[in-house]
Regions:
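Radical SAM [4Fe-4S] cluster-binding motif and immediate context
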Residues: 1-162, 170, 183
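C-terminal accessory regions of radical SAM enzymes
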Residues: 10, 176-273
Length: 273
């Protein structure tokens, strides 16, 4: 179990985080948790009974807890796991919950999104990363931009809030790629304005994590990985100081343009809901 630290989430609810699985089935080129980097580690998934036991212990120790944040990537990995989530939280009607989901986990189980809402899922997080099909292919991000729209629309229409993660500054990324990502984020925002669910963004500059496919490509082509520096241009976002660091701009565009797209995509969160 994690150490149970209570935080106030952005809804103002008292929340505790748990982990129900380790390892990842996906192989994103930018991610240190990619399947190809962890061949000696099998995906480990806790049983439904184990998760229920931990939840009971949490509520016994902290009876005023209102929300559970599930940190792992694979909690909602297929239709069966969605059913399991609903069964777990049906036993704790006083709790709402939030968790990460991959687009492909829902695109094949789109009819189950309503079940998640009925099971008191408050918010889902999706790693969207890019709206450029060219860049999605380069970073091994499975699912298309159309899939992202389909899933996002279903989530929002069912009254579940959505947080989308975006990354700018991948190697060889151009202004055209930036624009496609911004347009995808904007389209989801427009959908949210007409639905019960709300949409917010969390935007990052690409970082070449050691050992990843993109890191190795950069080293091979340039021999240089830049050191960590504070990015003053994006430090304006309150509560994001731990994310306002960069390890160099590896895109095809200048820093000013890269920062411009990071900032305006992040600002979509501030627009009227």
């Amino acid at each position: 179990y994690l150490g149970n630290e209570i935080v106030n989430n952005h809804y103002g609810e008292k929340e505790i985080a748990i982990i129900t699985s380790r390892g990842c089935a996906f192989d994103c080129a930018f991610c240190g948790g990619a399947r190809s980097l962890n061949k000696d580690v099998t995906t480990r998934i806790r049983t439904e009974e184990s998760v229920i036991m931990e939840m009971k212990e949490i509520l016994s120790t902290y009876p005023d807890i209102q929300s559970i944040r599930i940190l792992d990537d694979l909690f909602l990995r297929n239709g069966k796991s969605i059913d399991m989530a609903n069964n777990i939280f049906s036993k704790f009607p006083q709790l709402s919950w939030r968790g990460m989901v991959h687009v492909l986990s829902l695109i094949g189980n789109i009819e189950k999104v309503k079940d998640l809402h009925n099971g008191r899922c408050r918010e889902l997080f999706i790693g969207i990363e890019s709206g450029s099909e060219r860049m999605r292919k380069k970073i091994n991000k499975l699912g298309s931009s159309d899939d992202v729209i389909t899933v996002s629309k279903e989530i929002l229409e069912n009254g579940i809030d959505l947080k989308g993660y975006f990354i700018y500054g991948f190697p060889e990324e151009t202004k055209e790629d930036f624009q496609k990502t911004y347009e995808l984020a904007s389209k989801i925002k427009e959908i949210s304005l007409k639905t019960p669910g709300t949409f917010r963004t969390s935007v990052f500059q690409f970082r070449p994590y050691h050992g990843t496919q993109l890191y190795n490509e950069i080293v091979k082509s340039t021999g240089i990985i830049h050191g960590c520096e504070f990015n003053k241009s994006i430090s304006q976002f309150e509560g994001r100081s731990q994310f306002n660091f960069e390890f160099g701009n590896y895109s095809a565009e200048i820093d000013e343009m890269l920062n411009e797209y990071i900032i305006k995509t992040q600002k979509l969160t501030e627009e009227e809901q």
